[in-house]
UniProtKB/Swiss-Prot annotation:
GO cellular component: a single term: basolateral plasma membrane
Protein name as catalogued: Metal transporter CNNM4
Organism (species): Mus musculus (Mouse)
Segments forming domain CBS: 374-435, 442-508
Main localisation: membrane
Tissue expr: Cornea, retina, teeth (at protein level). In the retina it is predominantly localized to the outer plexiform layer, inner plexiform layer and ganglion cell layer. In the tooth strongest expression is observed in the cell body of the ameloblasts. Expressed at high levels in the gastrointestinal tract and testis.
Note: Shares weak sequence similarity with the cyclin family, hence its name. However, it has no cyclin-like function in vivo.
Intramembrane segments: 238-258
């Protein structure tokens, strides 16, 4: 077999030129195929296809293969067939330059065994030649071979002279470790790569400031971990250099071991890349980013050991970084960043909304001024300095709900004093004391602040205890004339606290939910003291508003028959203001036992309830005629207000009298209970009338409340109508007229006209329950 262009090119064309030449020769040989012998094969060139070990092309374009490998060479030519493998062999040459000196194949080598030609193309223009390389001798590490061909089986061998026909066989690098140890070492290096990569992210992400916080307020396990990590984390650059050096060293060693284990080529690159990326980067960093504290604490010994091993290199580098870059900047949050961090992390922390609002309010304290939270001057409740502290003025003060009230003179902007409600504790409204007398006596200081005062400074002033109310003012220099202080409003400690907690504080006396929006409190148990003011046209007996208020509250709270569940407070007040309900009795010193001194007489019918307001009475009760004295706020005849029908037994007994007066603290209650137990003090019922079995006689001048049974029953019906109004029926007009004709009843109001049959049934049922 003659080599096509077998004379060779001593200067060695580039690969592209050689392939082009081979293609032209192939076309030429096909054109001349009619003149060639059908048995003659022509080889134009060869290239490396594959091998089972390390192989490839060196920079000079020469094929190199490993010893003891199977190599597949792709041959190009004409009329290639199975017999062509007998026409191909290799000869050993000294070097690549000597190939060009001769074309003789003096001695064929046995180190390369040509097997066969396979996968011949349909046109017999290419095929795959299988060559087996034997192992080199111990003293040899490489050999160079040249391709030899012959035109026929008995023809002479001709050596190719170009570099494309050369083949290097190199020594195979054996494993320097046993296979099991090699695999184990690769696994250990993968683990170390993951540890260093994870620690690099986990430890460096732990801020030293955060570690100090965890040491103080973390769980017991977190505190333990933080105490271990914090000393080495303070050496930030030294730790960083040590971890990076360890990571690079481990990854480099791992790549070399994988290359030696798998062999060079695409498989070695792919396996090392996949192993390092997945097991050395992704998994450990994903783990340490979530559990860096625990991983760093449990691997602290390994970290310290490697820091010690890399000390000669990593420590100088870290010092250089400290010098060039400066000390590590730690995470410090200012006020705005801290508030934003709390807002962003709200879904993940355990702070409730109220706690978050308090923290936010406290952080904003230094950014707000008193002008932002003050109550405008025109919205403030104030009192004139020349006011008289009578019942009307004091009731107005009580209804305002404020405990500190500014006192102004001439105009509201001229605040001269502060009145505390507690200053009025010993003031009797009947004395009509001038307000100036009280303010001059206590002389509370008036605290003024400027409108641009920050809330934190205002809070510090309030904490000093001087005052919990301050007058907000500013310097007004607008227009012509000298500047002057202009009062803008009031600010209190409550306003500052509300701004801190970001919520309104409502106590039992507040009338507004917000002093800026002036939104009123929706539901308040507000006491209207104006109803107790002096009305001479309603009361025949002169009684002070304070005593009327005390009697009203005593009946509503201490006497079950007048409790708000039975009789509304509004109806009770009307009842007390009705003519002849509040009466006076002048005591006759010359005739102590005259008939008019007796409010109740034993064994005589009575249809009224009596509450002593002022004075003393003597009560005689029981079979033993036990006598004792009582005073103000003792009451009698509760059973007379509702008497059981004749066909019904009396109700369960209730005490004949009770006293809420503090004037008799030394009353002998044992004697009272003994005397009451010894007699039938509850009276009896004869044909629907209440008959008292005790006597009550005046000992001094008396002022007392006397409510008849009919007045009480009318009050109950009016209360029911107020609570549940009923539609008007035809018969109600007649009932209202009869109700008006009774002289002892109070004036008929609009609810009385709504009485109907249903009210009558309710009235009878109420009488039975009361009895």
């Amino acid at each position: 077999m003659a080599p096509g262009g077998g004379g060779g090119r001593r200067d060695g064309w580039p690969a592209r030129g050689r392939l082009l030449l081979a293609a032209l020769l192939l076309l030429w040989t096909r054109a001349a195929s009619g003149q060639s012998s059908p048995q003659q094969s022509v080889i134009l060139g060869m290239r490396l296809a594959s091998c089972n070990k390390s192989c490839g092309m060196n920079p000079d374009g020469i094929i190199f293969v490993s010893e003891g490998s199977t190599v597949n060479l792709r041959l190009y030519g004409h009329s290639l067939g199975d017999i062509s493998s007998n026409l191909i062999s290799f000869t050993e040459v000294d070097d690549a330059e000597a190939v060009h000196n001769s074309t003789n194949c003096l001695e064929l080598t046995k180190d390369l065994v040509v097997q066969r030609l396979v996968n011949v193309s349909r046109g017999n223009t290419s095929g795959m030649l299988v060559v087996i390389t034997k192992f080199l001798r111990r003293s040899e590490n490489m050999k160079l071979y040249a391709l030899c061909t012959r035109p026929r089986a008995d023809g002479p061998w001709t050596r190719w002279t170009d570099k494309d026909s050369l083949l290097f066989m190199v020594e195979e690098h054996g494993r320097f470790l046993p296979l099991w140890l090699h695999i184990l070492l690769v696994m250990v290096l993968l683990v170390l790569s993951g540890i260093f990569s994870g620690l690099n992210l986990g430890l460096m992400a732990l801020d030293p400031m955060e570690l100090r916080i965890v040491q103080n307020c973390g769980t017991e396990k977190e505190r333990k971990y933080a105490r271990k990590i914090e000393p080495i984390r303070r050496k930030g650059n030294y730790l960083l250099c040590s971890l990076l050096l360890g990571n690079v060293l481990v990854n480099t060693s791992l790549t070399i071991l994988l290359d030696n284990l798998i062999g060079s080529g695409i498989m070695a690159v792919a396996s090392s890349t996949i192993g390092i990326v997945i097991f050395g980067e992704i998994l450990p960093q994903a783990l340490c980013s979530r559990h860096g504290l625990a991983v760093g604490a449990n691997t602290i010994v390994l970290t310290k050991v490697f820091m010690l091993l890399t000390f000669p290199l990593s420590f100088p580098i870290s010092k250089l970084l400290d010098f060039v870059l400066g000390q590590e900047i730690r995470t410090v949050y200012n006020r705005e960043k801290l508030m934003e961090m709390l807002k962003v992390t709200e879904p993940y922390n355990d702070l409730v909304k109220e706690e978050l609002n308090m923290i936010q309010g406290a952080l904003e304290l230094r950014t707000k001024t008193v002008e932002d939270i003050m109550t405008q001057l025109h919205d403030c409740f104030m009192i004139r300095s020349d006011a008289i502290l009578d019942f009307n003025t004091m009731s107005e003060i009580m209804e305002s709900g404020y405990t500190r009230i500014p006192v102004f003179e001439d105009e509201q902007s001229n605040i001269v004093d502060i009145l505390y409600v507690k200053d009025l504790a010993f003031v009797d409204p009947d004395d009509c004391t001038p307000l100036k007398t009280i303010t001059r006596f206590y002389n509370h200081p008036v605290h003024f602040v400027f409108h641009d005062t920050k809330l934190d400074a205002m809070l510090e002033e309030f904490k000093k205890g001087k005052s919990h109310l301050a007058i907000v003012q500013k310097v007004n220099n607008e227009g012509e004339g000298d500047p002057f202080y202009e009062v803008l409003g009031l600010v209190t400690l409550e306003d500052v606290i509300e701004e801190i907690i970001k919520s309104e504080i409502l106590d039992e006396s507040d009338m507004y939910t917000d002093n800026r929006t002036r939104k009123r409190v929706s539901v308040k148990n507000k006491r209207d003291f104006s109803a107790f003011k002096d009305t001479d046209n309603e009361l025949k007996v002169k009684i002070s508003p304070q005593l009327l208020l005390a009697a009203h509250r005593f009946l509503a709270t201490e006497v079950p028959q007048f409790s708000p569940s039975l009789m509304s407070e509004k109806i009770l007040l009307r009842l007390l203001k009705y003519p002849d309900v509040i009466q006076e009795l002048r005591f006759n010193e010359h005739n102590r036992y005259c008939v008019r001194h007796y409010l109740y007489t034993r064994n005589k019918p009575a249809d009224c309830f009596v509450l002593i307001l002022q004075g003393k009475v003597e009560v005689e009760a029981g079979k033993e005629n036990m006598k004792f004295e009582t005073g103000a706020f003792s009451y009698y005849g509760t059973m007379a207000l509702s008497v059981a029908p004749p066909d019904r037994s009396p109700a369960l007994p209730t005490p004949l009298s009770r006293s809420a007066s503090l004037s008799y603290p030394d009353r002998n209650t044992d004697l009272t209970s003994t005397s009451l137990a010894g007699s039938n003090q509850f009276g009896s019922c004869i044909l629907g009338q209440y008959v008292s079995d005790f006597s009550v006689r005046a000992l001094t001048d008396l002022q007392y409340i006397k409510i008849t049974r009919q007045q009480y029953q009318n009050g109950l019906m009016a209360s029911r109508m107020d609570n549940s109004p009923q539609p008007t029926f035809d018969g109600c007009a007649t009932c209202s007229e009869n109700f008006m004709e009774r002289p002892e009843l109070p004036p008929v109001d609009e609810t009385t006209t709504l009485l109907n049959e249903r009210n009558s049934l309710l009235h009878r049922a109420s009488e039975e329950e009361t009895i």
